[in-house]
């Protein structure tokens, strides 16, 4: 075992993996030009929803166990992180409301709820009147609603800063360099930086941050508006996050069409969004794989070095971070790969 374990990548997966290594008494060095900061990766611009139920999509049966296991791992991670630093993370267990804009959206919500049940999970269908009792800012003419008490959230930027503070307190060294050699490092969590080695594609997502004159909502509100998804996420200090589009073009800046549609749909669900100030519009770039599953597993480099890959978490990097970080540390230190990660082997893309 190396005296110092090298983690390549300082996004949410790299930072949680490094933290879990320090939890096990390991010395760690992290390589990233902008660890936990505004860069070209996905973590800084993520919504931060820990929502295995609301986030699952049709035909994602292999992904769902990962999402559930990681959501279940968050309370332990947050307790252990709080034992090292008192920095805020924005971890919030208030729950999630899913609402439908019209009857077609309500029918889609029922179909999705049936899929949840097929996975032995459920969203509680509630009257719109109850949804508005929970969140008075909701539009009065919504067509349907469901409550998912187990879908939570974290504020990614706060979370990463807390991880950085904890890692520095434990003596982790940060090297602000970009690594381009795929054979460098013990654990590789570089997102799209590994696109030359694995079939990763950039999926862009426009995301907005608003400042509300007063708190708008307490729950995460996910809406379906003409079958388009939109979410309204409350943040500490009256900030609101609205997202997110999903596009596979080459625009690295927010498009007017995407910003317009996000605001229009958010206002349809929570009309008071119209009273907010727009303080940021940006684009996150998610590393997607052909099957939408992460890439997780061992490989041997060209120089014969043992290496662990933890990459390609696509839209679920924040949600999957608790499990990916824990599993990454454990597997690198010699434990078996958790069964949830069995479909995620890098070998499935080997030619």
Give a label for each model feature.
Residues 47-130:
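Dinucleotide-binding Rossmann-like beta1-alpha1 core, especially the glycine-rich loop
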Residues 276-351:
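C-terminal catalytic lobe of FAD-dependent flavoproteins
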């Amino acid at each position: 075992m190396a005296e110092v374990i090298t983690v390549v990548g300082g996004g949410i997966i790299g930072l949680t993996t490094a933290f879990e290594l320090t939890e096990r008494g390991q010395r760690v060095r992290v390589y990233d030009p902008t660890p936990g900061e505004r860069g070209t990766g996905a973590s800084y611009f993520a919504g931060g929803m820990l929502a295995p139920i609301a986030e699952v999509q049709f035909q994602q049966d292999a992904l769902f166990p990962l999402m559930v296991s990681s959501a279940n791992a968050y309370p332990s991670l947050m307790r252990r992180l709080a034992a090292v630093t008192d920095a805020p993370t924005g971890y919030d267990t208030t729950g999630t409301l899913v609402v439908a804009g019209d009857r077609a959206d309500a029918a889609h919500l029922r179909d999705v709820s049936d899929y949840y049940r097929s996975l032995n999970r459920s969203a509680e269908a509630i009257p719109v009147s109850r949804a508005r009792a929970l969140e008075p800012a909701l539009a009065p003419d919504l067509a349907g609603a469901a409550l998912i008490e187990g879908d939570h959230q974290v504020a990614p930027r706060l979370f990463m800063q807390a991880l950085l503070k904890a890692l520095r307190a434990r003596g982790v060294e940060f090297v602000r360099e970009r690594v381009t050699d795929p054979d460098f490092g013990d654990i590789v969590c570089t997102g799209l930086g590994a696109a030359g080695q694995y079939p990763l594609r950039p999926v862009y997502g426009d995301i907005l941050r608003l400042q509300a004159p007063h708190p708008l909502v307490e729950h995460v509100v996910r809406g379906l508006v003409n079958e388009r998804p939109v979410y309204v996420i409350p943040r500490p200090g009256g900030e609101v996050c609205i997202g997110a589009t999903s596009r596979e073009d080459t625009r690295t800046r927010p498009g007017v069409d995407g910003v317009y549609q996000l605001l229009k749909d958010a206002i349809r669900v929570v009309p008071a969004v119209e009273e907010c100030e727009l303080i940021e519009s940006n684009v996150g770039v998610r590393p997607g794989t052909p099957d939408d599953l992460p890439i997780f597993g061992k490989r041997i480099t060209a120089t014969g070095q043992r290496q662990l890959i933890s990459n390609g978490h696509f839209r679920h990097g924040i949600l999957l971070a608790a499990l990916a970080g824990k599993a990454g540390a454990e597997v690198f230190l010699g434990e078996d790969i958790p069964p949830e990660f069995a479909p995620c082997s890098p070998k499935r893309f080997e030619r």
